[in-house]
Curated annotation (Swiss-Prot):
Catalytic activity: [(1->4)-alpha-D-glucosyl](n) + ADP-alpha-D-glucose = [(1->4)-alpha-D-glucosyl](n+1) + ADP + H(+)
Catalytic activity, EC: 2.4.1.21
Gene: glgA2
Name by which UniProt lists this protein: Glycogen synthase 2
SUPFAM superfamilies for this protein: UDP-Glycosyltransferase/glycogen phosphorylase
A single MF term (Gene Ontology): alpha-1,4-glucan glucosyltransferase (ADP-glucose donor) activity
The keyword Glycosyltransferase appears for this protein: yes
Protein family per UniProt: Belongs to the glycosyltransferase 1 family. Bacterial/plant glycogen synthase subfamily.
Signal peptide annotation: none
Function per UniProt: Synthesizes alpha-1,4-glucan chains using ADP-glucose.
Paired cysteines (S-S): none
Alphabetized Gene3D superfamilies for the sequence: Glycogen Phosphorylase B (3.40.50.2000)
UniProt entry keywords in alphabetical sequence: Glycogen biosynthesis, Glycosyltransferase, Transferase
A Gene Ontology cellular-component term: cytosol
Amino acid sequence: MKILQVASEVAPLAKTGGLADVVAALPKELRRMGHDVRVAIPFYKEVSSGNLPVRKARKSAEVALGGELHKGYLRQTALGEVPVYLVENRDLFGRDHLYGPPEGDYPDNPLRFAFFCRSVLQFLKRMDFRPDVIHCHDWQSALIPIILKYELGHDPFFNRTAVIFTIHNLAYQGVFPADALAQTGLDPSLFSVDRIEFYGRINLLKGAILAADAITTVSETYCHEILSPGQGCGLEGVLERRQADLAGILNGLDSEEWNPSLDRRIFRNYSSKSLAGKGADKRELQRELGLKAGASIPIIGMVGRIVEQKGIDLVIDLLPRFAAEELQLVILGTGDLRLMHQLHEFRNKGVKNVSINLGFKEPLAPKIYAGCDMFLMPSRFEPCGLSQLIALSYGTVPIVRRTGGLADTVIDVTANPREGNGFSFTEFSADACWDAVQRALAAYRDREGWRKIMRRGMLRDVSWRSAAGKYEELYRTCADNRRG
């Protein structure tokens, strides 16, 4: 099949979160399965300053939006054997950030991503590349299913193209004031309750949910959770309307990038058969971060965005308890300025067993996964989560809140001693989180039992093979339905 993946980021070209990893790994696996898979993202400033060679494809697009004509150019590079198309417009994408500075999003984001989506559709025609499936990711690509259904529904070039739309995080919906409609180029008739209108505003994610041939989320549990008012973010009714076309497909992990037996970024390689190298990684992490050396001191790691979704506010409340325990805590991340300020204030107290590293330092992340004994993810909600998959692969036992993809991948040792690969808690509270930490610390004292827990996690297949097979099946079903 011919498949185009459309997203706002792909690793390592442009990345702010897990979306970029998915859009890098899924096409690679589909390519191995014999499909003609390509990727389209904007040509951001950070892409142009990267190391991959980028060539101009001598194709241009013109899009009228907001009363102005915007011109774009097509550039091309590749990630392995996967071609990557880059939509260039320096005014719109030649900026320092993908979506906006720390203070907030760029106000013209609806125009920026409308231009991107419309340019992609123009370039497909100019290249004469007719995808069987266009797979769109998150609100930044939401205009593609909307345009194909309501504007180009009778266009012979696209009438056999199925559109899959994946929700990576329902909290980000592409909601804008009603007067931003002109920036999208959509007909005003689409500003209605059964199209893109949402409480007097534009909601691009809603429009994509209603327009796509099929909708997926990134784990089975999250797929069920978003049908409830608690996690539906106001769209539970819309999702319920499309429930027959909604599926949860658990993300995989790129086992070429994240493999402790091959990873060149860590101090010493190791595997489930030979764990000795993990001890060396622990010693090196302690040395690098100025922590007290000691093989018997448990280290708990956290890597990710410093935002309330990730439960970092629980961890901040628990910092005095962590500081008083015979353990070490390592935090790496960047995000919400208020939460980062609270972490900075605690760091200034000079607590010796807590290492807080603000700002995302890419080389440190794999060292934390390899060098820690446990990995903490107390998320409020977690559509899928990649960090716990990495932790499992690296023998770093996850401690998680039982939600979304965390519930689908981490089996609690307390509830299931024979198959457990981590520790979990249900209630979103500091005490419930601390109870799970204490259960993990108690299990850690049984060294042989702990190694069994580590190995169970490392032996779990978290690769993209299974997920790619499910996507392939969905693609075929939707493409066949399109052909009639």
